[in-house]
Amino acid sequence: MNNKIKLIKEDITQLEVDAIVNAANSSLLGGGGVDGAIHRAGGPEILEECYKIREKQGECKVGEAVITTAGRLNAKFIIHTVGPIWSGGNKNEDELLSNAYKNSLLLAKNHSLKTIAFPNISTGIYHFPKERAAKIAIQSVTKFLKQDNQIQTVFFVCFDFENLEIYNKLLQTYK
């Protein structure tokens, strides 16, 4: 199981994987952090597809996910998911964050993708506690991989050493 999960500290926009997960906001129109970086690096095609999705379904709800082209990125697709804003833990944030991971993995499966890279969803400007978010991420992905053999590799792409250390410590308990 654990050989399917890889932990790295890199620029997620540079990865050659089937899908990069974007920690998007509900507008799908780009923003700060990883969301802005993906839109800038991927180019206007990503935004164009996001506009089309909005025309069809409206905004993307928290915990849900949608898929677009990856534009100029080395990945084949971008899976945009909306993580919850941390509000103290009393507004279903844990379940919503878990859903963001599960729904992203389901989209990858439905598109026959084998490799997927996740950023640290909701731990930036959404202020989700990093250790709590990492635990939810690892549990959600591990549970999904136990039930599905199609996805071969899941990358957790940490944007700082603090997240890298947290994930590394937690992944030791899943060996």
From Swiss-Prot:
Domain Macro: residue ranges: 1-175
Disulfides per UniProt:
none
**Which Pfam families does the UniProt entry name for this protein?**
Macro (PF01661)
Q: Which residues cross the membrane?
A: none
For this protein, the record's InterPro entries field holds: Macro_dom, Macro_dom-like
Protein family: Belongs to the MacroD-type family.
NCBIfam families, alphabetically?
PRK00431.1-6
What's the protein here called?
Macro domain-containing protein LIC_13295
- What organism is this sequence from? Leptospira interrogans serogroup Icterohaemorrhagiae serovar copenhageni (strain Fiocruz L1-130)
